[in-house]
UniProtKB/Swiss-Prot annotation:
Keywords: Activator, DNA-binding, Nucleus, Transcription, Transcription regulation. CDD domains: HTH_XRE (cd00093). This is Endothelial differentiation-related factor 1 homolog. GO terms for molecular function: DNA binding. The gene is EDF1. Probable transcriptional coactivator.
Length: 148
């Protein structure tokens, strides 16, 4: 009992592995062998410049039993985008540059493969001057003064 006094502190544990070592494949396998809980998660869209995320609730899709897919842009809207773009003499690349999107986004919207995003739809509407949402699809866009 002589060595346990109030001024000394005894630490009985080792320093854990650093973050880089803990992420290695070797460390993960060793932890699994010891029976410890190991959580792995995959990085999504790492290294890419993803501006627009899919805003639909994915948990809602998980609970859904029948149709497990998002609504796509109707072909009618794709045709309106294509006609409006061609009437202004723009290529898909020109339109994409004008609205600060990638040409692939425009191609997806025109072919009906894209999941509708109101922000992108609004930019395309203003660029080609035609309505793409609501009941008057294909009608000219009314540009009035903004009121507060």
């Amino acid at each position: 009992m002589a060595e346990s006094d109030w001024d000394t502190v005894t630490v009985l544990r080792k320093k854990g592995p650093s973050a880089a070592q803990a992420k290695s494949k070797q460390a993960v396998l060793a932890a699994q062998r010891r029976g410890e809980d190991v959580e792995t998660s995959k990085k999504w869209a790492a290294g890419q410049n993803k501006q627009h995320f899919i805003t639909k609730n994915t948990a809602k899709l998980d609970r859904e039993t029948e149709e497990l897919h998002h609504d796509r842009v109707p072909l009618e809207v794709g045709k309106v985008i294509q006609q409006g773009r061609q009437s202004k003499g723009m290529t898909q690349k020109d339109l994409a540059t004008k609205i600060n999107e990638k040409p692939q986004v425009i191609a997806d919207y025109e072919s009906g493969r894209a999941i509708p995003n109101n922000q992108v739809m609004g930019k395309i509407e203003r660029a080609i001057g035609l309505k793409l949402r609501g009941k008057d699809i294909g009608k000219p866009l009314e540009t009035g003064p903004k009121g507060k």
